[in-house]
């Protein structure tokens, strides 16, 4: 990361509550939400922030949602939050947790009001429409948890690894044309600001020249000591595969383990992709 970007994200760290001891609000406070611009990191990996040549969304699941009903009785629920990958900003995850915590002692007459409030606040924060669904626990009791992504698991490959900083040179192809669905549970990187580990699974769906599986796995493992936010890591994987492998079509889907009750799940694709049916919950989530 160049010095200009380091300065930008250091300013973000200083202005946000990442890595700092935070006070918790007793009542609803939308001012806790903190946006982070997408553009600087996209410029670093040569993704035009204004381009429509890639598509996708960011999906967040929040497992610790609670507020008070009109009689003061607590309500608990789960929330699913999603927004388009072309929003000007992402939401800083700690600020989202603190925002949701501010709802805990706040009174709302019904679920619909909670949904409308959250959607309005998050949309204002990132400068783009945010879809919010809030589900009482009784509605999600039968939710399926999947052991893994569909596809060929790369993690069974017996390879030697010694590079733990991002190395796209591992990526290569043969002349054979294929359509493949691949995945790995070995994705690990670190938060750009706090250096805390981020654990995830990644699925790669592509059509084109066959990508060398061993090299792809080494490439994914090379993120192990890399510092970047979840969304930025998935976009970097997408951009590197497009650059080094030049597939006809590509989708990269990351599903990360939760922190502070939240998990983040970005997808980037060369084709328009609908959110419906994509929010599958993996075993580590």
Curated annotation (Swiss-Prot):
InterPro entries: GTP-CH-I_C/QueF, NADPH_dep_7-cyano-7-deazaG_red, QueF, QueF_N, QueF_type2. SUPFAM superfamilies: Tetrahydrobiopterin biosynthesis enzymes-like. The active site is at 191 (thioimide intermediate), 198 (proton donor). Substrate binds at residues 91-93, 230-231. Its EC number is 1.7.1.13. NADPH binds at residues 93-94, 259-260. GO terms for cellular component: cytoplasm. Its main location: cytoplasm. Homodimer. This is NADPH-dependent 7-cyano-7-deazaguanine reductase. The gene is queF.
């Amino acid at each position: 990361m160049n010095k200009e970007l380091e300065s930008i994200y250091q300013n973000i760290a200083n202005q946000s509550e990442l890595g700092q001891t935070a006070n918790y609000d007793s009542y609803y406070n939308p001012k806790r939400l903190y946006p982070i611009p997408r553009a600087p990191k996209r410029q670093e990996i040569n993704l035009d922030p204004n381009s429509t040549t890639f598509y996708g969304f960011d999906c967040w699941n929040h497992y610790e949602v609670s507020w008070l009903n009109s009689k003061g009785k607590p309500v608990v629920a789960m929330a699913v939050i999603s927004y388009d990958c072309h929003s000007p900003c992402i939401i800083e995850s700690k600020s989202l947790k603190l925002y949701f915590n501010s709802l805990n002692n706040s009174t709302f007459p019904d679920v619909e009001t909670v949904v409308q409030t959250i959607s309005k606040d998050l949309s204002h924060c990132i400068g783009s429409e945010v879809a919010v669904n809030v589900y009482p626990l009784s509605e999600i009791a039968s939710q399926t948890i999947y052991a893994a992504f569909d596809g060929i698991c790369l993690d069974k490959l017996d390879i030697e690894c010694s590079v733990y900083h991002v190395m796209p040179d591992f990526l290569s192809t043969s002349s054979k044309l294929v359509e493949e669905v691949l995945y790995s549970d070995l994705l690990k990187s670190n938060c750009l600001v706090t250096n805390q580990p981020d654990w995830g699974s990644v699925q790669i769906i592509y059509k084109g020249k066959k990508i060398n599986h061993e090299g792809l796995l080494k490439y994914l493992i090379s993120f192990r000591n890399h510092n970047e936010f979840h969304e930025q890591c998935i976009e970097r994987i997408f951009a590197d595969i497009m650059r080094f492998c030049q597939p006809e079509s590509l989708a990269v889907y990351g599903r990360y383990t939760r922190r502070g009750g939240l998990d983040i799940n970005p997808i980037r694709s060369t084709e328009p992709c609908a959110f419906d049916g994509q929010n599958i919950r993996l075993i580590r989530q």
